[in-house]
A protein has these predicted regions:
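Short, polar/charged alpha-helical segment
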Residues: 37-57, 377, 395
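Conserved C-terminal helix/tail region of periplasmic/extracytoplasmic solute-binding proteins
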Residues: 153, 229, 356-407
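Hinge/lid segment of periplasmic solute-binding proteins
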Residues: 89-142, 168, 194-197, 276-278, ...
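Periplasmic solute-binding protein
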Residues: 92-100, 122-159, 187-209, 229, ...
Length: 407
């Protein structure tokens, strides 16, 4: 039966309205937490991701470094955790071992964006637990020895020190109180940055995070204490973080500094002297090398209501790895990305040293109780450097605490 023309048009109009008023696909909001003070990296990448598509919007919250773990644990326990979090790599095992992080092993294996074979083994291992992958390294870094070539020449020192004893002797020669110049600066603060700096010395001294009182580790702490006792370093090293302590070097008020590649951008512009970077000195000539392995891992909380969308965000961040160094002075955790020349000869030479140092870098842990282990370590060197305990007694006490944790 044919509909009358008016009835047909009315039916067509109603059908068109129905089609036009079908509900649109809702935009998914993914919440993300990361630390503040990361050269604006996450802020920029989140902005770019949000601008690149309209299906997912990332809401980013920046949390102070010292507060991130405790706030994240509380949030997960109360059902208020974000979808994505960026955690310092030694803290990752605390969350993944407790079932707080989503197992992304299969998602990564099926991803057309992420290829785990191109990641450095150390950073990738820090995002793993019990044979499964719970996160992805954002970047990686390590520490080496910065030195002021002008002050070295003035003191008659031809090269950067290669052993601990040479470092101590050079610091004595370079120390110049009359001109407000210390021999060396670094971070020995009571916190993760201090452990980050001290653990490589323990490892070069034959120890590990689970064995911190070897004779070599004791010698390392004796040297740290001597540097402070002889006023070859400012007392501020006990409280300053790496960024601020290296600022002393940049200002020309310390002849050496132990710090990382995140300093290179401002050093190229702020330092008004000739400088270089050398591998960390070893306990003895030709002795075993080590260095810290830093930076953050991205993971998805197991409680996330939007795991697929959250994984798309992580894939996007992984796809932007070639931007990490040129824009943010971060070294990618991937071996397939060549660092571009910066145009600054000193910076380019320093990057080669840092890349070599990375081959010796070791993770902190991984262990679910890393924060307790780290506290035992920084409590020990703080106690020794402030004269409360001898270096040996302090490290023996730390070892007793750590043994009770790791068994």
């Amino acid at each position: 039966m044919k509909l009358p023309r008016l009835a047909f048009l009315a039916t067509l109009a109603l059908s068109s309205v129905a089609i036009l008023t079908l509900p649109a696909v809702a935009q998914v909001t993914v919440k993300m937490w990361s630390i503040d003070g990361d050269n604006g990296l996450y802020t920029k990448l989140v902005e770019d991701f949000n601008a690149s598509q309209s299906d997912v919007i990332v809401e980013s919250r920046l949390v102070p470094f010292d507060d991130l773990v405790n706030e994240a644990l509380k949030a997960f326990a109360t059902g208020q955790a974000p979808d994505i979090i960026s955690l310092d790599n030694p803290d990752f095992a605390l969350f993944s071992s407790r079932g707080a992080m989503l197992d992304i092993t299969d998602r990564v294996a099926n991803s057309e964006v992420i290829d785990t074979s191109v990641y450095y083994p150390g950073p990738l291992a820090s995002a793993s637990w019990d044979g499964k992958l719970y996160g992805l390294p954002k970047a990686t870094n390590t520490i080496a020895l910065f030195y002021n070539k002008d002050l070295f020449a003035k003191a008659g020192i031809a090269e950067a020190p290669t052993t601990w004893d040479e470092l101590l002797e050079d610091a004595r020669k370079l120390n110049d109180p009359a001109n407000n110049v210390y021999g060396i600066t670094w971070s020995a603060r009571a916190g993760e940055e201090g452990t980050f700096q001290f653990l490589p010395w323990v490892q070069m001294g034959g120890g590990s995070f689970a064995e911190v009182n070897t004779p070599g580790a004791v010698k390392a702490l004796e040297i740290w204490k001597t540097l402070l006792d002889e006023k070859l370093a400012s007392q501020d090293v006990l409280s300053l973080g790496q960024w601020d302590s290296t600022g002393t070097f940049n200002a020309g008020n310390a002849a050496m500094a132990i710090s990382g590649p995140w300093e290179l951008g401002r050093m190229a512009t702020d330092a008004k002297f000739d400088w270089g970077v050398a591998l960390l000195p070893t306990e003895t000539e030709g002795g075993p090398r080590s260095s810290a392995m830093g930076d953050f891992n991205l993971g998805i909380f197991a409680s996330s209501q939007h795991p697929d969308e959250a994984f798309k965000v992580i894939e996007y961040f992984a796809s932007q790895s070639d931007r990490l160094f040129p824009e943010f002075s971060n070294i990618p955790a991937r071996s397939d990305i060549a660092l571009p020349a910066t145009g600054d000869a000193r910076t380019d030479a320093a990057l080669k040293v840092f890349q070599e140092q990375l081959t010796y870098a070791q993770p902190r842990g991984p262990h679910p109780e890393w924060q307790k282990i780290s506290k035992a370590i920084y409590d020990a060197f703080q106690a020794a450097m402030t004269g409360q305990m001898s270096p040996k007694d302090a490290l023996d006490a730390a070892q007793a605490t750590i043994k009770g944790i790791v068994g």
